[in-house]
């Protein structure tokens, strides 16, 4: 019960503290501080599906401060440059908002929040100044907005610190053990080589859990810098987990063509179940002893899996203790250079930026042309929704959430505006109870992810006259309520009308990147061979899982290419100038497949790559390359021929 009530109490405290401190400091519009506290605390909890872990709210608050400062500077620059042309000024703000949304769609989700804020903060400041009829007051509005927003953020952070936030460390400690057991179960399924569907489900679940563990590492670093050693171990643990998935899947794949790949003694040993991490540790000891005895007949993939699992267990002890990194661990951590993944959603990001610009620009032009009294509220809501919704995996659902919320905010805001707030003017305690009750009920519903709740809370606070002094002008209330509802509805219509058709394009680009990774692994350059692309490849595989849920064929293609990349990266390719030059040629052709725009050219380069792979196989035979090199190259060439149409055009 305490866990359930902690976040509603935290949100209530943040809202009331922001309101009272805002009035005490004589801020002109304390409602901006209250609304900021609600968005920072409520938005974090809505995303987490409950009370967020320690550090998440502070990190989000810092990003909001950074975004607000950037937005204020942008508003001042735009105003100084175009003070004599209000239309140009508003259009530049719309372009700035679209640019920020485009850029935020390309970077890490954790950091994109600051750019989203920077985009609509500039728009809000200029729109507010324009609505008041004094563009020369933009610097004053910028300072006021900064003060109010920072106050709201500090109140949210203070509430988070007082009401004992949860640490994610215990969850990580339990997950690393549970993940090892799941890895052993996947290896059992792959060695048994029976149910293909069950194997697909098992490795798909492991990819998701490994990705989730990587996200937990980011969350842990938000909590405190004292987890630095644990974070380094977790980063390498992510690579080891992905390596184990790859080796297990390759074991299954090899048995399709070589049923006798796994010797009987290994099959018998792998039949024993392991329910806990301690059981897996015992099975690992037995496997290592068997490998030491029969070193000449041990399957290569099984040996690689055992090596990765042994290092996994070693790092797990350090993760739980957070002790100093030993020399042995340091050797594991510095063995490879992790390469970050480039975004494959360039077209998706462009669509998001265009949606934001079109929505805000149309609203600006209509407002300036008609002189609509609700225009400023509509513009503010357009900027907020388009900036926040576009960063979500499903912008349409986020926009619907705001539409539902703004619809509820009209009667709820009217109740507060006409009956509750006027009766609290003589008592600060009654005012705190009224706002606190709104925050408490909203907090209960937000942590359950009740659709429309976050929008309703923000919309209700926005239409209330939490200003200094309070003035109950019913016409102004109607204007604000109507403006923000129309703004949310227009944002929804823009998302529906400007459709995002980049799904197939992104899927094809991802599959071709897997192909390029497999081809580029054929190299004799030692620096290139040290580059660890595995986390980036699985990050893109996770994106593919989200883009095409249930399309198991695409997952199998991607996983097969990742397996090919890992096997070729470890292969003992003969070192000579002829092969090195041909490796560069293969990489160039594979890169052209990704970069060209037309399907005809893409098909031409793909067919050229297949011919070059045939020539490469002849070269390997000529230079007496070992089976560990020729076999994965042959498998890669056959796989590319089989799925040529899928890789060229989804």
UniProtKB/Swiss-Prot annotation:
Keywords: Cell inner membrane, Cell membrane, Membrane, Transmembrane, Transmembrane helix, Transport. GO terms for biological process: carboxylic acid transport. The chain crosses the membrane at residues 7-27, 32-52, 61-81, 87-107, 115-135, 148-168, 365-385, 402-422, 426-446, 450-470, 478-498. One of its GO terms (cellular component) is plasma membrane. It is found in: Cell inner membrane. GO terms for molecular function: transmembrane transporter activity. It is a multi-pass membrane protein. Belongs to the aromatic acid exporter ArAE (TC 2.A.85) family. Forms an efflux pump with AaeA. Could function as a metabolic relief valve, allowing to eliminate certain compounds when they accumulate to high levels in the cell. This is p-hydroxybenzoic acid efflux pump subunit AaeB. It comes from Pantoea ananatis (strain LMG 20103). The lineage of its organism: Bacteria, Pseudomonadati, Pseudomonadota, Gammaproteobacteria, Enterobacterales.
């Amino acid at each position: 019960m305490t866990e359930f009530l902690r976040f509603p109490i935290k949100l209530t405290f943040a809202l009331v503290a922001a309101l009272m401190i805002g009035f005490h400091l004589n801020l002109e519009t304390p409602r901006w501080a209250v609304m900021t506290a609600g968005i920072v605390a409520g938005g974090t909890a809505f995303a987490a599906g409950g009370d967020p872990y320690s550090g998440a709210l502070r990190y989000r608050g810092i990003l909001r401060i950074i975004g607000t400062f950037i937005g204020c500077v942008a508003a001042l620059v735009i105003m100084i440059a175009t003070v004599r042309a209000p239309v140009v000024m508003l259009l530049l703000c719309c372009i700035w908002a679209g640019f920020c949304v485009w850029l935020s769609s390309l970077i890490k989700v954790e950091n994109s929040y600051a750019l989203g804020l920077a985009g609509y903060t500039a728009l809000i400041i200029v729109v507010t100044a324009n609505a008041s009829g004094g563009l020369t007051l933009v610097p004053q509005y910028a300072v006021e907005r900064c003060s109010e927003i920072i106050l709201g953020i500090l109140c949210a952070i203070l509430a988070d610190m007082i009401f004992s936030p949860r640490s994610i460390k215990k969850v990580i400690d339990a997950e690393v053990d549970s993940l090892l057991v799941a890895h052993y179960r996947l290896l059992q399924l792959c060695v048994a080589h029976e149910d293909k569907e069950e194997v697909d489900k098992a490795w798909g679940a492991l990819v998701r859990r490994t990705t989730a563990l990587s996200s937990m590492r980011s969350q842990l670093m938000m909590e405190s810098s004292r987890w630095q050693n644990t974070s380094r171990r977790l980063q390498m643990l992510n690579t080891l987990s992905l390596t184990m998935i790859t080796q297990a899947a390759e074991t299954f794949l090899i048995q399709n063509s070589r049923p006798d790949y796994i010797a009987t003694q290994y099959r018998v040993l792998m039949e024993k179940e392991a329910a806990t991490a301690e059981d897996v540790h015992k099975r690992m000891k037995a496997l290592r002893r068997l490998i030491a005895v029969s070193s000449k007949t041990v399957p290569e993939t099984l040996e690689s899996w055992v090596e990765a699992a042994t290092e996994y267990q070693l790092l797990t002890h350090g993760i739980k203790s957070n002790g100093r990194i030993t020399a042995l661990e340091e050797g594991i951590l510095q063995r490879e250079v992790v390469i970050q993944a480039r975004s494959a959603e360039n077209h998706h990001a462009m669509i998001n930026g265009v949606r934001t610009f079109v929505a805000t620009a149309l609203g600006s032009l209509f407002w300036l042309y008609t002189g609509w009294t609700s225009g400023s509220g509509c513009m503010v809501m357009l900027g907020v929704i388009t900036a926040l919704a576009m960063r979500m995996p499903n912008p349409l659902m986020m926009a619907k959430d705001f539409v539902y919320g703004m619809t509820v905010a009209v009667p709820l805001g009217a109740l507060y505006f006409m009956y509750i707030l006027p009766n609290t003017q003589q008592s600060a305690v009654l005012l705190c109870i009224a706002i606190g009750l709104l925050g408490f009920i909203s907090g209960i519903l937000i942590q359950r992810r009740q659709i429309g709740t976050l929008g309703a809370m923000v919309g209700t606070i926005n239409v209330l006259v939490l200003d200094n002094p309070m003035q109950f002008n019913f016409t102004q209330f109607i204007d604000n309520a109507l403006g923000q509802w129309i703004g949310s509805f227009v944002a929804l219509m823009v998302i529906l009308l400007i459709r995002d058709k980049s799904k197939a394009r992104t899927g094809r680009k991802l599959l071709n990147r897997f192909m390029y990774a497999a081809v580029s692994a054929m190299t004799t350059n030692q620096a290139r061979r040290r580059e660890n692309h595995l986390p980036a490849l699985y990050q893109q595989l996770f994106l593919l899982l989200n883009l095409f849920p249930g399309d198991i064929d695409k997952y199998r293609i991607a996983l097969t290419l990742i397996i090919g990349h890992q096997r070729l990266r470890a292969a003992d390719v003969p070192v000579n100038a002829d092969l090195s030059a041909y490796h560069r040629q293969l990489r160039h052709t594979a890169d052209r497949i990704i970069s060209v725009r037309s399907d005809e050219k893409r098909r031409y380069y793909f067919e050229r790559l297949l011919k070059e792979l045939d020539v490469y196989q002849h070269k390997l035979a000529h230079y007496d390359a070992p089976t560990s090199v020729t076999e994965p190259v042959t498998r890669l060439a056959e796989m590319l021929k089989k799925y040529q149409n899928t890789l060229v055009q989804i």
